[in-house]
Amino acid sequence: MKQNILKFNFKFKSNEFFVTEKNIFAFNFIKKWPDWQQTLVYLYGPEKCGKTTISQMWLEASKGIYLSSENFEEFFSDDLNIDYIKSNNWLIDNVDDLIKKDKELNSNRILNLINIIKDNRNAFLLMTGKKSPKYIDCDLNDLISRLLSSIVLE
C-alpha cells in the first residue's frame, strides 16, 4: 500500500491569527501599513510568539521581498541595485541570527540596507528578531543605533 501525500496551498488570512494581550499592539500596528510614520520597523519576541505570522501578513499586504538567513547572503553576493532596493519593501527575518552567523559581514550588510531604505521614503523595511535591539550581540554601534531608532515592537 502506498501513502499519497496531498499538498494543499492554504492562503493565510489575518482573521485566522490569534490576537492576545501580548501581540495586539504589534498586530494592530502592522495592519496600519502603509500609514507608518517611519520606514523602519523592528519586531521581536521569543520563538512561537507570532512574529513570523504577523510579518508574513505585512509581507503579503506590502508585496515585499522576504530575506531569510538562506537567501540573505545570496542577495548580497550580487552587486546591489540601489534603485531596486528603493523601489521595494523588505522583510529581514531573524536579524539577530543573521548577525550571529557572521557578525561583521552581516552587520554591515544589514546597516547598508537600512541606510538605503532610511534615506528613501518609498520603501519600508520590517525586521524580526528574538531579542530587543539593545540586547543583540553586535560590535557595529551604528547598526544598533539604527535598530533602536526604528519603531520597535514586542
Segments and roles (model prediction):
Residues 133-148:
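Short regulatory helix/loop adjacent to the ATP-binding pocket of P-loop NTPases
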Residues 83-109, 113-116, 120-131:
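Conserved P-loop NTPase "ATPase switch" module shared by AAA+ and STAND
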Residues 150-154:
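Conserved AAA+ ATPase "SRH/arginine-finger" region at the nucleotide-binding site
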Residues 59-89, 100-107:
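Short glycine-rich substrate-engagement loop in P-loop NTPases that contacts/grips substrate
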Residues 38-42, 63-66, 89-91, 124-126:
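Residue-level preference for the first positions of well-ordered beta-strands
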Residues 1-32, 37:
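A short, basic N-terminal segment
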Residues 49, 71-74, 96-97, 131-135:
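Conserved nucleotide-binding/hydrolysis micro-motifs of P-loop NTPases
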Residues 37-55:
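Walker A/P-loop nucleotide-binding motif
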